[in-house]
A protein has these predicted regions:
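A structural signal for well-ordered alpha-helical segments within the folded catalytic domains
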Residues: 26-30, 34, 90, 142-143, ...
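Catalytic core of Fe(II)/2-oxoglutarate
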Residues: 76-77, 81-88, 98-196
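Eukaryotic charged/polar low-complexity linker/IDR segments
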Residues: 93-95
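Signature of the catalytic double-stranded beta-helix
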Residues: 2-70, 81-84
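Short amphipathic alpha-helical segments and their helix-coil junctions
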Residues: 71-75
Length: 196
């Protein structure tokens, strides 16, 4: 579910509604901006132009989202090395595996990149070409109450999700993001995107 549904009365529990409300709020955005400081550009009167996706008035500069996600228990990487949408400002991932989930893998992996990434296939999930894929420099385990967040300030912010092994249960997580809406005509970095 995405924030546009989770914020509607009666769709989810009050606890989940409040969780979503906070993580799509100007208060949360400002907390993240404080952490990442100069990596996130100041927007004048940001409190008047930020709203959860699906709740804006059509000309808000920044959209926020809080999404509950379930990936099927298939034994292959659910996400190869890629970069995110250049309009995305930040992304956070909260892992919520079932207590009885004894699978391995499903880790969030941060990659070193080789050279400057200049071009990606938008339809292909912005997967990074083999020539730009470097070694994994950090892995964040898929375990309960683990949260990882990054500022999407570079076309070299390459990350992936490792292959899950012996998975019988869905991989559960919450995505928390903010991104520039198209009306803002802004992005965090420049990159050529093609559709193939």
């Amino acid at each position: 579910l995405k924030a546009d549904e989770m914020l509607k009365p009666g769709v989810v529990s009050e606890l989940w509604r409040k969780f979503t409300e906070y993580h799509t709020s100007i208060e949360f955005y400002n907390e993240v901006k404080y952490i990442f400081k100069d990596y996130i550009t100041d927007i004048p009167n940001v409190e008047n132009t930020l709203s959860p996706r699906g709740w804006d008035n059509g000309n808000d500069m920044i959209g926020t989202d809080c999404q509950t996600v379930m990936h099927s228990p298939i034994d292959f990487s659910s996400r190869t090395p890629h970069i995110d949408n250049p309009r995305e400002i930040y992304a956070g991932l909260l892992y919520m595996p079932y207590p009885e989930d004894d699978s391995t893998g499903g880790e969030f992996q941060i990659h070193r990149s080789v050279g400057q990434i200049k071009r990606v296939n938008e339809i292909g999930g912005r997967e990074v070409g083999v020539e730009n894929q470097g070694s994994i420099v950090k892995s964040v385990p898929y375990k309960r109450n683990t949260f990882v967040m990054f500022c999407n300030n570079s076309s070299n912010s390459v990350h992936s999700v490792s292959k899950r092994e012996n998975a019988t249960l869905h991989r559960r997580s919450v995505n928390v993001i903010a991104e520039y809406n198209r009306v803002a005509k802004k992005s965090m970095f420049e990159i050529e995107e093609f559709r193939k």
